[in-house]
Amino acid sequence: MLPLGTQLINFDLPNTITGQNYPSTQIATDRPVLIMIICNHCPYVVHYHDELKRLHHNFSEQISFVAISSNDVNNYPEDSPEKMKELWHELGFSFPYLYDETQTVAKAYQAECTPEFYLFSDQHNLVYRGRCDSTLPKSNAVSYTHLRAHETIP
């Protein structure tokens, strides 16, 4: 697991929405950052789709959001950059959705599964890493209890 206190790890990945690279230096430096390691096909990610949209809508003025997919498109063609862009439009997301083809960034963050969340303070020090909460697909409503525990997200 990436140790708490770790500085935001630099990256420069293709934004599947704009077609341009999105460097981590483009992230606002004066507010917290939520890095979300997600993908299109995973039922655990699908479980959070509506809540990710709501969370971004409610907190995008206070927190920078960045989603990254690092899945192998040979094994998961539904996670291709083209499909990522389609899903982004279909769901009405408005945060960057980046593609980590070599899995370099996911490995640097020591991501083990999807979804995995990394919340950095306004100083860009890691204050939380892990799941949103303990809900599972087709079980409870999403509560974000784990993410909220550190009090960076109200």
Regions found by a protein language model. Give the residues of each.
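N-proximal helix/coil linker or "cap" segments that precede and/or mark the start of modular domains
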Residues: M1-D12
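A short beta-strand-turn-helix
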Residues: D12-P32
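Short active-site neighborhood of thiol/selenol oxidoreductases, capturing the structured segment around
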Residues: I27-P43
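Structural microenvironment flanking redox-active thiols in thiol-disulfide oxidoreductases
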Residues: H47-H89, V105
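Short, internal strand/loop/helix patches
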Residues: K85-T114, V127
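A short, hydrophobic beta-strand/beta-hairpin element that forms part of a small beta-sheet core
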Residues: P115-R131
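Non-catalytic, surface beta->alpha helical segment in thiol-disulfide oxidoreductase systems
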Residues: V127-Y144
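Single conserved hydrophobic/aromatic residue that forms the stacking wall/gate
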Residues: H146, H150-P154
